[in-house]
């Protein structure tokens, strides 16, 4: 990582609770967490909830839930505390306004009385497109004109005076970027109603929280000129010690190449994958690998390996595209790499509460389930079928074929994986194998027949077959009576 400051690295993830957490948003959390952990630094969570028109309280907890699920533990922030709180931006309003007063006194801000209608009229008179917006005209408003506006009951907003020249910016992911002079108008930092804007709150909070690095989406790139100007103004009044290093990474696109939006596309909802049983380590891997590759592990790595190898300069500058099949395949890969103990621990939350006998059976079954299942939910369904004392059959097998299989299994000695495999592969007719599969595992888990027979043992395995035979006999008698 180039140009690391002598002070410890402090990164920030600063989401706004305006919708369900999207994959693109959570990807920024993954990168900032990995950067902080890679350098032994601090990962800060700050909730930017100043946009009253869009913020929804019901989306606050999901932001925390998705980070907890993925193991992206924050060192400072809501629920954790820290020396730089509070960590909800609306609770920091007086801090923002105090800094704004200092900026105004230092001449970094100026009062702006222009209404949108007056700006549009000036643009039109100058032969310009009114959609160009504010024209910096209030920089030159005289004190007499300001007094007249106040006498008329008008209240000013406070704008930051941007530099007149070009802005040269060294992006950690993209390299040097030059913004032409005049590419951005002087931004409002405090509205006429006295409320601070994001253009003030973000830089002030970064400064007061000592943020050194921030990786964010490239939708924020056009804001760089005004944000750099704000950081430098804060330096000049002694609020900021340095300008944070910024990296702008490409957005995540849907499979149809449109921008992912969790409010419009369910596939963008990060928590939906948790609810579907995707492993947290898979999602961290997948999101990090959308445009980034590990220097030695390529596209498959654990969270620990991500931390060890993370370098934002390896982020590609073209957008990543969501591929759900790739995600599910990656989940299977990670499932296979779990130890039996890790697999059992991951599977338990997907099952009904287990007593000691069933937990012991699950522990014995873990290697087979891990080898055969493609996901934790699939493994959980197989485990539930293994625990069930009732016959697994949902359809009646061939009675005669099942009875023949029952006789062969009864005579089998010893009851081992080797003897059972030999019997199923060559000692039984195909119809009998099919009948046993129907009775013991049910159609959904037929590929686990041998594993089920070994795990169930002769007593429980034959009991399942006997249950199906008894049910078939009872049905035969009912049919005769009818």
Show which residues each predicted segment covers.
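N-terminal Rossmann-like or analogous alpha/beta NTP/dinucleotide-binding catalytic cores
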Residues: 2-128, 223-230, 237, 241
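Glycine- and acidic
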Residues: 11-18, 45-49, 209-215, 267-268, ...
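Catalytic adenosine-cofactor/nucleotide-binding cores of aminoacyl-tRNA synthetases and other
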Residues: 52, 234-240, 245-391, 441-482
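Active-site cores that bind ATP or allylic diphosphates and position pyrophosphate for catalysis
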Residues: 111, 115-263, 269, 294
């Amino acid at each position: 990582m180039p140009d690391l400051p002598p002070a410890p690295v402090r990164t920030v993830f600063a989401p706004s609770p305006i919708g369900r957490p999207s994959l693109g948003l959570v990807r920024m959390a993954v990168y900032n967490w990995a950067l902080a952990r890679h350098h032994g630094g601090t990962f800060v969570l700050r909730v930017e909830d100043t946009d009253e028109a869009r913020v929804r309280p019901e989306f606050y907890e999901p932001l925390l839930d998705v980070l907890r699920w993925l193991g992206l533990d924050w060192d400072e922030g809501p629920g954790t505390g820290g020396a730089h709180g509070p960590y909800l931006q609306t609770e920091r309003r007086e801090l923002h306004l105090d800094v704004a007063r200092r900026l105004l006194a230092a001449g970094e801000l100026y009062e702006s009385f222009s209404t949108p209608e007056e700006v549009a009229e000036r643009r039109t008179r100058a032969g310009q497109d009114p959609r160009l917006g504010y024209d910096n005209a209030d920089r030159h408003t005289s004190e007499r004109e300001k007094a007249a506006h106040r006498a008329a009951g008008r209240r000013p907003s406070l704008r930051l005076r941007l530099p007149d020249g070009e802005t040269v910016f060294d992006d950690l992911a993209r390299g040097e970027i030059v913004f032409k002079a005049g590419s951005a108008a002087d931004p409002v930092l405090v509205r006429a109603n006295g409320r601070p804007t994001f253009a003030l709150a973000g830089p002030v909070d970064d400064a007061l929280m000592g943020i050194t690095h921030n990786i964010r989406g490239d939708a924020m790139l056009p804001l760089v000129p005004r944000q750099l100007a704000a950081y430098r103004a804060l330096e000049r009044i002694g609020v900021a010690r340095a300008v944070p290093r910024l990296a702008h990474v490409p957005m995540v696109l849907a499979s149809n190449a449109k921008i992912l939006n969790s409010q419009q596309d369910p596939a963008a909802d990060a928590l939906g994958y948790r609810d579907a049983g995707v492993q947290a380590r898979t999602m961290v891997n997948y999101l990090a690998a959308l445009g980034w590759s590990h220097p030695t592990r390529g596209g498959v790595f654990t969270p620990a390996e991500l931390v060890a190898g993370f370098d934002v300069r390896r982020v590609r500058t073209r957008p990543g595209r969501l591929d759900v099949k790739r995600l599910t395949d990656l989940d299977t890969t990670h499932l296979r790499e779990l130890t039996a103990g890790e697999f059992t621990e991951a599977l338990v939350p997907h099952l009904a509460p287990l007593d000691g006998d069933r937990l012991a059976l699950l522990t014995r079954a873990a290697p087979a389930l891990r080898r055969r299942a493609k996901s934790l939910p699939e493994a959980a369904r197989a485990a539930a079928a293994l625990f069930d004392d009732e016959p697994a059959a949902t359809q009646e097998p061939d009675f005669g074929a099942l009875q023949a299989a029952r006789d062969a299994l009864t005579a089998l000695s010893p009851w081992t994986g080797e003897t059972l495999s030999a019997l199923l592969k060559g000692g039984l007719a195909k119809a009998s194998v099919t009948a046993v599969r129907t009775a013991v595992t049910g159609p959904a888990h037929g590929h686990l027949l041998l594993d089920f027979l070994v795990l169930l043992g002769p007593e429980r395995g034959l009991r399942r077959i006997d249950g199906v035979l008894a049910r078939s006999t009872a049905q035969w008698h009912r049919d005769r009576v009818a």
